[in-house]
């Protein structure tokens, strides 16, 4: 934009240049610095700086994330961890000697929950945590639960 078209050029010849007669563009009309964040500048802070005011909880020093790592898997999805080639073999035999060993930890799951039904085939489940209902259902089909660290 050429200088001759700017607003400051258009204000030339007018004493206050659009800045008013009394205050004359002096002092601090909105307060100094970040004043009025909860009062007359509230809309700006709410829109552009949410969470600026208010309390924040305590930090957890030396938090070991692994203590809270517990992805869950339900019983109805447990057989998806068995290889598809071997799955048909296990389901047809259904003998306790040839029970599949499902290591949930190796597949990235920390806890077994009891939603769903299991096929009537014994299975050995290795997990860090198992819910009471899941353990009952696994035992009901002749399976075993092994807790691993």
Swiss-Prot record:
Pfam families: Ribosomal_L27A. One of its GO terms (biological process) is translation. GO terms for cellular component: cytosolic large ribosomal subunit; nucleus. One of its GO terms (molecular function) is structural constituent of ribosome. It is found in: Cytoplasm. Keywords: Cytoplasm, Ribonucleoprotein, Ribosomal protein. Gene3D superfamilies: 3.100.10.10. InterPro entries: Ribosomal_uL15, Ribosomal_uL15/eL18, Ribosomal_uL15/eL18_sf, Ribosomal_uL15_CS. Component of the large ribosomal subunit. Mature ribosomes consist of a small (40S) and a large (60S) subunit. The 40S subunit contains about 32 different proteins and 1 molecule of RNA (18S). The 60S subunit contains 45 different proteins and 3 molecules of RNA (25S, 5.8S and 5S). Component of the ribosome, a large ribonucleoprotein complex responsible for the synthesis of proteins in the cell. The small ribosomal subunit (SSU) binds messenger RNAs (mRNAs) and translates the encoded message by selecting cognate aminoacyl-transfer RNA (tRNA) molecules. The large subunit (LSU) contains the ribosomal catalytic site termed the peptidyl transferase center (PTC), which catalyzes the formation of peptide bonds, thereby polymerizing the amino acids delivered by tRNAs into a polypeptide chain. This is Large ribosomal subunit protein uL15. The lineage of its organism: Eukaryota, Fungi, Dikarya, Ascomycota, Saccharomycotina.
């Amino acid at each position: 934009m050429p200088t001759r078209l700017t607003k400051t050029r258009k204000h030339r010849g007018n004493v206050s240049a659009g800045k008013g007669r009394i205050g004359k563009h002096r002092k601090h009309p909105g307060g100094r610095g970040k004043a009025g964040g909860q009062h007359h500048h509230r809309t700006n802070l709410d829109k552009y700086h949410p969470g600026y005011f208010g309390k924040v909880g305590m930090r957890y020093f030396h938090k070991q994330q692994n203590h809270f790592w517990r992805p869950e898997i339900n019983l109805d999805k447990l057989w998806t961890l068995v290889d598809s080639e071997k799955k048909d073999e296990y389901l047809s035999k259904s003998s306790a000697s040839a029970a599949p060993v499902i290591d949930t930890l190796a597949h990235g799951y920390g806890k077994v929950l009891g939603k769903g039904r299991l096929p009537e085939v014994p299975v050995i489940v290795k997990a860090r945590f198992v819910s009471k209902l899941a353990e009952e259902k696994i035992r009901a089909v002749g399976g075993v639960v092994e807790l691993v660290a």
